[in-house]
Regions:
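Helix-loop boundary and gating motifs at the non-cytosolic
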Residues: 1-32, 188-239
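C-terminal ends and interior cores of transmembrane alpha-helices
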Residues: 56-73, 171, 269-281
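Transmembrane alpha-helix termini and helix-breaking/packing motifs in multi-pass membrane transporters
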Residues: 66, 138-159
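Cytoplasmic helix-loop-helix junction between adjacent transmembrane helices
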Residues: 81-134
Length: 302
């Protein structure tokens, strides 16, 4: 919701997709850098302790961003405020998946030892991916409806409202929260980022984040060029629907392939399924291309 809402308000005020795209890119990079840090803080201090410090700052910064854009202050102030806002972004999906692992395997941090455990966790993660896609289906529709029917800033404001309501509810679910794991004085394990496999995944997912961000701005520009800007949210919802369908399928399959092989397969599939979007010359054909492109997303991020 953030990136789409940002595009609507910035384009409405500045009439520049270049500025909107630059802001969206800066926001995505900042988020990518910030979320691992806050995930680590959540592991060390507990999720609730981290969230009660982070979320108020994020909300305040987004309110400031909205005010600065509407007041048409110098563009650099928009960048500063959005950097601050996204610097306090948290990986909500990661936090929830960590809770699933805690509930299903409370006495261990991994499920590699047990095949049945791996299938149960994969099913839980697939369910969570499905719920993510439900949000990604409804979110763009809500943001687009608010931004095009009420005011350009209404999309950002609706996102802020969801954060203000949702995170207190998430924090209150204490029974699912994993206990904090204080940092050892002498950690026998090397830093995860030093693992070459992790480095490869980080590089791929960083570029993947850029792909996701570009889809939002390109979709808005595509629909506006054809005089149907209000349909951009529906197109993004169709994209998420394709991912939701694949999340359901992925959840019922007992995969024999290792995770690394599946990651490469679905990364390749996403690349191939992105090609038809280059040849879509109507909203209908773009909707079809987005739907099938979404098929590769959920299995990839799971």
């Amino acid at each position: 919701m953030d990136s789409l809402a940002l595009i609507f308000i910035v384009v409405a005020v500045s009439d520049s997709y270049a500025i909107a795209g630059a802001l969206s890119a800066v926001a995505s990079v900042t988020m990518a850098l910030a979320t691992p840090h806050w995930s680590r803080v959540a592991d060390r201090n507990g999720q609730s302790a981290m969230l009660v410090r982070v979320i108020p700052i994020k909300v305040t910064a987004f309110v400031a961003f909205t005010f600065l854009v509407l007041q048409e202050t110098p563009t650099w102030t928009w960048f500063v405020s959005i950097i601050i806002a996204e610097a306090f972004s948290v990986n909500t999906g990661g936090l929830v998946r960590r809770r699933w692992l805690h509930i299903l395997s409370p006495d261990k941090t991994t499920t590699d030892e047990d095949e049945s455990d791996r299938h149960i966790v994969n099913t839980a993660y697939s369910f969570e991916a499905l719920m993510d896609e439900v949000v990604f289906i409804l979110g763009p529709i809500i943001v687009t409806a608010c931004a095009t029917s009420i005011a350009p800033a209404a999309g950002v404001i609706s996102g802020i409202i969801f954060v203000v309501i949702g995170f207190p509810l998430f924090i209150s679910a204490k029974e699912t929260e994993p206990p904090p794991t204080p940092k050892r004085h002498v950690d026998p394990h090397p830093a995860v980022i030093r693992n070459k496999r992790v480095q490869a995944v980080v590089l791929a997912t960083t570029l993947l984040g850029g792909f996701f961000g570009s889809i939002a701005i390109v979709t808005v520009a595509f629909t506006e060029a054809r005089g149907h800007e209000s349909q951009s949210g529906i197109l993004l919802a169709i994209w998420a629907l394709g991912s939701a369908v694949s999340a359901i399928i992925n959840g019922v399959i007992k995969w024999k392939l290792p995770s690394a092989a599946r990651f490469l397969i679905f990364l390749f599939a996403l690349t191939v399924l992105s090609i038809p979007m280059l040849f879509a010359h109507s909203i209908t054909w773009l909707a079809v291309a987005l739907f099938f492109n979404g098929f590769a997303i959920a299995p990839l991020v799971i």
